[in-house]
Amino acid sequence: MGSEMCIRDRLSHAEDWLVFPENIGESICIDETAPSNGELYTIVSNRSSRGGKGTIIAIVKGVAADAVTEALMRIDEDKRLLVKEITMDMSNSMRLIARRCFPNAMRTIDRFHIQKLACDALQEMRIAHRWDAIQADTDAREEAKCLGEAYTPIVLANGDTHKQLLARSRYLLFKSADKWTESQRQRAEVLFETYPDLKEAYSLTHSLRMIFSKNTVKDAARLSLARWYNKVDDSGFKSFNVIAATLYEHYDEVLNFFVNRATNAFAESFNAKIKAFRAALRGVTDIKLGQCKKLRGKFINCYLCLQIHSLWS
């Protein structure tokens, strides 16, 4: 009976927040997710639970620091002070939440968010070249048409036109060179020969990835990042200079990764589980408490989170 009352009490405010103080641990993650219709939620989870029972510490509608802080402050202070490390992305709201609610915790920026910024910058450069290639191809076609000549695009060494080369190179730029297929290797050679700036940008992205991949200590990583900053500065690439400035702003929190090598990969994986759970119950509008009791165990927290009525719309 007491357990049912507890569940009923949680469901009464589930539209806005759910908190599970008993699930707090020394190493936690905070991340945002959009399980339905693009509506954002902030999820705080316990890394040691590994996605099983006791994983979710809190789920709050929205990402506003004040709203999330208000919900997390419902957890007793002595429990919040037990948290030793919190992993997160580089958003100011996440940093503020962590500082307010878990003052004893070391704040660690997720390495994968950093690497994604570099990949996005590289892809931005590729896309810019592709638009230029499309424009050049269109102009050449129009010129040939005006002259009454047949248009034949330039074909590169691997059989691609410039447009095709830039379109088909998207996925290989995400991968390390040692993981390229033979055709990707050939395409990369042509790409880098034709667009040297993409080769340099790819090298910057790869070197940043390698800094985080090496099992090194914090001081050594500090030196490696300083060298990377110098390379970025020498390149003159605007998008990479923006990344370098962002990393510099979060310098200590970025370097904290090398203490325990903690990431938000677990949180991202668990968020995917929540989305899958939401999709499996698409169309359900009214689930009775008796049915809720059947979901005890591994996914009880997921179920309670997904009782937020906007997720069921």
Each model region followed by its residue ranges:
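RNase H-like nuclease fold core
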Residues: 11-85, 90-100
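Helix-loop elements that line ligand-binding/catalytic pockets
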Residues: 152-236
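Short, small-residue-biased leader/transition segments that mark boundaries at the very start
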Residues: 1-7
